[in-house]
Swiss-Prot record:
Cleaved signal peptide residues: none
Stated name of the protein: Serine/threonine-protein kinase SIK3
E.C. code: 2.7.11.1
Tissue note: Expressed in hypertrophic chondrocytes in the growth plate.
Occurrences of domain Protein kinase (ranges): 66-317
Gene name tied to this protein: Sik3
Record's keyword terms, sorted: ATP-binding, Cytoplasm, Kinase, Magnesium, Metal-binding, Methylation, Nucleotide-binding, Phosphoprotein, Serine/threonine-protein kinase, Transferase
Species whose genome carries this gene: Mus musculus
Top-level division of the source organism's lineage: Eukaryota
Residues carrying Omega-N-methylarginine: R1034
Cytoplasm as UniProt keyword: yes
GO MF term (any one): magnesium ion binding
Residues covered by the UBA domain: 344-384
Any one GO BP annotation for this protein: cartilage development involved in endochondral bone morphogenesis
Biological function: Positive regulator of mTOR signaling that functions by triggering the degradation of DEPTOR, an mTOR inhibitor. Required for chondrocyte hypertrophy during skeletogenesis. Negatively regulates cAMP signaling pathway possibly by acting on CRTC2/TORC2 and CRTC3/TORC3. Prevents HDAC4 translocation to the nucleus.
Amino acid sequence: MAAAAASGAGGVAVAGAGGAGPAGRLLPPPAAGPPAAPAAVPPAAVPARPTAPASRGSMAARIGYYEIDRTIGKGNFAVVKRATHLVTKAKVAIKIIDKSQLDEENLKKIFREVQIMKMLCHPHIIRLYQVMETERMIYLVTEYASGGEIFDHLVAHGRMAEKEARRKFKQIVTAVYFCHCRNIVHRDLKAENLLLDANLNIKIADFGFSNLFTPGQLLKTWCGSPPYAAPELFEGKEYDGPKVDIWSLGVVLYVLVCGALPFDGSTLQNLRARVLSGKFRIPFFMSTECEHLIRHMLVLDPNKRLSMEQICRHKWMKLGDADPNFDRLIAECQQLKEERQSDPLNDDVLLAMEDMGLDKERTLQSLRSDAYDHYSAIYSLLCDRHKKHKTLRPGALPSMPQAMTFQAPVNLQAEQTGTAMNLSVPQVQLINPENQIIEPDGAVNLDSDEGEEPSPEALVRYLSMRRHTVGVADPRTEVMEDLQKLLPGFPGVNPQGPFLQVAPNMNFTHNLLPMQSLQPTGQLEYKEQSLLQPPTLQLLNGMGPLGRRASDGGANIQLHAQQLLKRPRGPSPLVTMTPAVPAVTPVDEESSDGEPDQEAVQRYLANRSKRHTLAMTSPTAEIPPDLQRQLGQQSFRSRVWPPHLVPDQHRSTYKDSNTLHLPTERFSPVRRFSDGAASIQAFKAHLEKMGNSSSIKQLQQECEQLQKMYGGQVDERTLEKTQQQHMLYQQEQHHQILQQQIQDSICPPQPSPPLQVACENQPALLTHQLQRLRIQPSSPPPNHPSNHLFRQPSNSPPPVSSAMITSHGATSPSQFQGLPSHGAIFQQQPENCSPPPSVALTCLGLQQASQSQPVTIQLQEPVDMLSNMAGTAAGSAGRSIPISPSASQIQIQHRASLMAPFSYGHRPLSKQLSADSAEAHSLNMNRFSPANYDQAHLHPHLFSDQSRGSPSSYSPSTGVGFPPTQALKVPPLDQFPTFPPSAQQQPPHYTTSALQQALLSPTPPDYPRHQQVPHILQGLLSPRHSLTGHSDIRLPPAEFAQLIKRQQQHRQQQQQQQQQQEYHELFRHMNQGDAVSLAPSLGGQNMTEQQALSYQNADSYHRHHTSPQHILQIRAQDCISQGPSPTPTHGYAHQPPLMHSESMEEDCLCEGLKEGFPDKSSSTLTKGCHNSPLLLCTSGPGDPEPLLGTVSQARELGIHPYGHQPTATTFSRNKVPSRESVLGNCLERSSPGQAMELPDHNGLGYPVRPLVSEHLRSRTLQRHHTIQNSDDAYVQLDTLPGMSLVAGKALSSARMSDAVLSQSSLMGSQQFQDEEDEECGVSLGHEHPGLGDGSQHLNSSRYPATCVTDIMLSHKHPEVSFSMEQAGV
């Protein structure tokens, strides 16, 4: 694409993007290995014409004093080769241009490029050393940058830190400023044309589009690469040359810092529209100073862009350490504005050249006249060596006459004009209407190295497929240079010596480029190409017109692939080169081609030292004749391949391909650490068979022994008995496996310490279960001893639950395996109803007491859910079914029937969960799900007895349960708010263990403010407990069982007494008609605590207090904890309608947020607006305001505002706030946001809201999704209902955070901070009284993101790290 727009009709695609100038990128990316030393062939030993084609490596081609190494780049009319200077041993790049393929216009452009490069002598610009010309060819000898393109550097290493990017950008600025001071405009600045030398210093290349300009005069030629082109170029206007370079510099700086392009599009029209809009995204990690510099360089109006002087004085350029080289180069540039300053001659270099035998006067004459012949080239190379190494190594001049004149033979001169010339330069091949390639006129060979394999750097770029997209480097191609030249498995094509007919016989003094043709006669004028005219040339690779350049290096890839199709099939050369691969790359599990079992790997590793000794030198000598007859008179070597793995058909690479695989997708190489050879997949079975024996004799002896042992007559009874024992053993094994799977999927694992060791020894079982469910783990489950998230050895769910797991998207299987949709399962359950046993709570890591302890799991059957939805069975409560841990008593059909109604109880997620989001979801469940879980058996020394109830003191008959009208708003039941439940509606009393009460108990109504979470318990409430180093301080199962037994009798007595007492008080108050006095009498809460809470409501419809023994004595210190259950202890209450809550990460947004925000990536700062602890939506009739409070009121009272809100939200480090609803389920509560309407096809009611189009749903957050400025937010938010401009600004700033709640990222955009703080105060102080009884939720625009940010930052736990590293970003 870049090439198409850059070259125009008839352009010379040699450099850059195949543009008009052939200089292009003269230098290649580096090879992985050390360069191969060229063969030192004296000039006298080189024949004028070889009698036979020279094989590769046997005889090096030479051009004058240069010995050619290999091809490093190709274009349509030129080829770039790396060479070694025979005198100085310096590496150079030689661009060879075929003049016969150029028209007059393009030939003038080449002369212009040579003229411009002669004017540029700068440490950060590619240096021109020498120019040679024959009747047909032009040779440009330039500096060689071994570091390759900075584009490839970004591909391999990712974006740069700003410190390193500043160093590189300063060097680029000095070079461009130097050009501008010389009245030269580059016009093709991009990452592909920025090269790196051995010290990673910048070298600007490709002056094919450069031109001389006059200050104040405009240019009109469209040239350059579209992603880096200025908007005035896209508009076809005349433009100021330096301003175009400044725009390109802004794009280059963005690419260095971000590793991506600010403007990119799938088509040229899309790219043009984005560039002309001038809007781009600033990622959150970019500093404010760098953003300011980029914004002022990428300005649509050229007159408002920064100048080079302003860029040099910018604040971002002044950061960091002092750079004296930058200051010196800038000062020299300013001195060069008027006249050219010539460097003084180096006398040491001149003396060294005299010692070599070169005439000093001839050297001085060459330097003064800018001859750019071999004298000036040697001088320049020695000067560079002296600057770098401070040493000169004069060597003997090759055996050539000092006059450097050669008389070419007559036959050679005739051959140069004939067809025997083998110096091949690629030539444009036109495409006819039938899409057939037309052979060019003449019989000139196009390429001297048609049989060359592509260079490694060319393959790396080709595999990344797009030059303007940062891809993943492929270490398979990083082979040693001495092994590149002849890849095994392919017959080498012997190229003919391309330059031998020219080099030794060239008369340099007569064939030098004429000086008069290089000097401009006044102002050079060339016919300008039409603006945006589509080129008429088409390449072979189908990448678009002129898609290749001399710098591309991939010109021979297509031909190479075609040659592979014609050759015999075999192992791919890219894979068979494994001994030379220096780097070890981790295995990508998602693209791996099947993992072998552990035993096979161990056998292979134990015997891999023998793998080179398996083959026998003379196999027939060791094979007996009778065995040879059995083998069909075939030698052992011919039987190496199994019948199904013959060389023509075996799978030698990770993809089924018998040719050079050129994938279009990006991938990580899938070679394993243990691969000792590329054919390990093919030889694996053979190695396992032959690993223990290296000789056929051993196998034959073992076979004879087996025949002796089992070859005799065997009793039939013995065989029958053995067969029966085998069948019994198989049945027993199958039964045990089935029991283990059922037990693991239903009951949590036991907390005994031996289970930790068993878990550590069974990673393969977990992997097997994940593969059985077709779930690819995002990361292997850790085996840390204190990891409470991955304690069970196998958390495989029942088969019916796989539908729920896969419907969530790419959830993290290590945290959510076997966990169905929370909102779907528990949306309409009453509070005293517990989750079904199939949910096993595997991610909580809280384990059961012992095998012998009976467990009562309360579950709600589908009939209850249907009755709740229909509103018919009002008094239906959860039924408790005692389930024994022994799996033999559990029927799979019953378990499947329990799981069936939950499989479709939620909407599928709109996008996959990232590992970081899954971690946040686990954080929310771990922190708040064991609501009524008394941790006395874990940490008995941390809790006082007087404020703690018994661990299992809660039962469904305690009276804290929610009535079935909780789930649906049933109008007939609203008329009887205090009607007591009948005896038939109360579930029977079953003894429950402390573990089940901890896992399945509802949220307690409120937390007194003196309850704190100890630091050692904070790890249990955090998903990163395994990373904090906390040890496991839980009681052994025996002591825990004894503790449960001691408390059972006391608990039952206490429950009976309390129930009788509460019933007496209930009837007494009902008879007296005093419903208000229920609050202090039934709740058991003293008036001191009531006075300390600002949200106290004495209305009987809003009872918020229950017995203190149901209060969990732990909560996070600095986190907004879970909300209470706003229901009376007895009787029906007027409950607020419930809003549907999505099951997992992104879809659990409240519907109000979906109205207000078009992108869920902004939910980091705005999700808490609707579910804020300050927003209480449970107002009763005639009492709209008592429950409403503000943060200021809460802080004045010295408490956190989470005493009585039903919608208290926890701000975790991730995007997802935990929701606590009026439901008492243990996993996730929904927020009472909007009225529950008619249920959908899944039986779940969805709140009525304005229809929002699908494009407003969120997209996956990329690395740079922050909008450039606030105007972009206004455009997107104007059509959204209820979204204020302040919230739009907050949304624009929120996208900077990239889902990381840290001080630096959240507050990174400071431009709207002051006004948002002011708006925050107004909103919090004055918005609440306006709420009426019918208001179900507050619009998110009333609470700007910055207000929520302050709340999140103020309640962040001091010990929890909110860094990007732990978040997995």
